[in-house]
């Protein structure tokens, strides 16, 4: 894994392609700055990695072990910590900052975050089931239909798609394009929609090659 960055989703807007004039939906992300809170090497920990922090908070918001850990790197109290494994020994030191300029326009990234929670949702909203007839005497409008056979197997199979909690789960959107980088304000402009609502914590990493194209 390469070095990534933590950020928060600010919202969506659109920009226009200068050549074709086509509007491009984009999401604005406040990416970093993320101070390096720990450096791990093959000699000391058995693998190479760096740990970064994000979102400064007051000391009273953290426990004493967390404060002691951050004090070793002389960094301010941070709400979130994230570790990124590296193939080679890191060239960063505790206290250095990871900023948005680690990415460039045109880079492909994977973005992970918690999706918006939709509460207890039914079959149509959660699984895109077709509804029944609304007229002609039908009383089956939004019912699930059959959930299994009779005496055999005499039970509902595990994994049967039914109503339940929808959303509020960890989601990764892969191979999104970085359209623009604002290094001064640590902003990433990423093409497309990202998980969660404004304020959601996002983990942005260089894209892993999955499939073709």
UniProtKB/Swiss-Prot annotation:
Keywords: Ribonucleoprotein, Ribosomal protein, RNA-binding, rRNA-binding
GO terms under cellular component: cytosolic large ribosomal subunit
GO biological process: translation
The keyword Ribosomal protein is assigned to this record: yes
Source organism, top-level taxon: Bacteria
Signal peptide span: none
Region described as Disordered: spans on this chain: 135-155
Pfam families, A to Z: Ribosomal_L3 (PF00297)
One function term, GO molecular function aspect: structural constituent of ribosome
Function: One of the primary rRNA binding proteins, it binds directly near the 3'-end of the 23S rRNA, where it nucleates assembly of the 50S subunit.
Record text on subunit structure and interactions: Part of the 50S ribosomal subunit. Forms a cluster with proteins L14 and L19.
UniProt similarity note: Belongs to the universal ribosomal protein uL3 family.
Protein name: Large ribosomal subunit protein uL3
Organism per entry: Synechocystis sp. (strain ATCC 27184 / PCC 6803 / Kazusa)
Lineage, broadest ranks: Bacteria, Bacillati, Cyanobacteriota, Cyanophyceae, Synechococcales
Gene name for this UniProt entry: rplC
């Amino acid at each position: 894994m390469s070095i990534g960055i933590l950020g928060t989703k600010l919202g969506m807007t659109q920009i226009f392609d200068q050549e074709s004039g086509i509007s491009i939906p984009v999401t604005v992300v406040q990416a970093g700055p993320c101070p390096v809170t720990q450096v791990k090497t093959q000699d000391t920990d058995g693998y190479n990695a760096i740990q970064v922090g994000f979102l400064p908070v007051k000391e009273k918001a953290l426990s004493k072990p967390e404060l002691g850990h951050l004090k070793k790197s002389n960094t301010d109290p941070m709400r979130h910590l994230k570790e990124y494994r590296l193939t080679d020994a890191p060239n960063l030191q505790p206290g250095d900052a990871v900023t948005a300029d680690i990415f460039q326009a045109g880079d492909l990234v994977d973005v992970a975050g918690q999706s918006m929670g939709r509460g207890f949702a039914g079959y149509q909203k959660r699984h895109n089931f077709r509804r029944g007839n609304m007229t002609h005497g039908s009383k089956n409008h939004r019912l699930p239909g059959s959930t299994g056979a009779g005496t055999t197997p005499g039970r509902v199979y595990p994994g049967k798609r039914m109503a339940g909690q929808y959303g509020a789960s960890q989601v990764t959107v892969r191979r999104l394009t970085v359209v623009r980088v604002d290094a001064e304000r640590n902003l990433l402009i990423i093409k497309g929609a990202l998980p969660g609502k404004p304020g959601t914590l996002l983990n942005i990493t260089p894209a892993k090659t999955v499939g073709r194209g």
